Curated annotation (Swiss-Prot):
EC number: 4.2.1.59
Function: Involved in unsaturated fatty acids biosynthesis. Catalyzes the dehydration of short chain beta-hydroxyacyl-ACPs and long chain saturated and unsaturated beta-hydroxyacyl-ACPs.
Top-level taxon: Bacteria
Organism: Blochmanniella pennsylvanica (strain BPEN)
Top enzyme class: lyase
Active-site residue list: 54
Protein name: 3-hydroxyacyl-[acyl-carrier-protein] dehydratase FabZ
GO cellular component, one term: cytoplasm
GO molecular function, one term: (3R)-hydroxyacyl-[acyl-carrier-protein] dehydratase activity
Keywords: Cytoplasm, Lipid A biosynthesis, Lipid biosynthesis, Lipid metabolism, Lyase
Recorded catalytic activity of this chain's protein: a (3R)-hydroxyacyl-[ACP] = a (2E)-enoyl-[ACP] + H2O
Amino acid sequence: MITDTCVLHIEEVLELLPHRFPFLLVDRVLNFEKGKFLRAVKNVSFNEPFFQGHFPGKPIFPGVLILEAMAQATGILAFKSTGKLAPGELYYFAAIDAARFKRPVQPGDQMILDVEFIKERRGIARFKGIATVNEEMACEASMMCARRKEI
């Protein structure tokens, strides 16, 4: 049973992530449970700047940016699960394993980002992420993020 659910709109996402256009890849958070999971949305628009070159006549959302969107969702879950960081600390993307791409993501798609907390040890947290479009898996990966002083 979900006991601590919430919706975070873009204004709240901007408070949690340092990313900004054109690299902010989470539009809103549909729900989450602290220390457990988070579900977010990325609305894929033809106006995304990378579609001009990836690929002309057959625009496909770059796989590395699907992974980045999942990593940003992971960062939000980490922030919401642990509360405030110490001054000068950030969560940094630390590792990715077993990334698999199952279907292309195209303009007009709505990508659902599901990330799940697996475990945390000494400031390093492991997560599993899945991106879906129309309930079809587009990508899955295991990820880690680390709480560290700002560089």
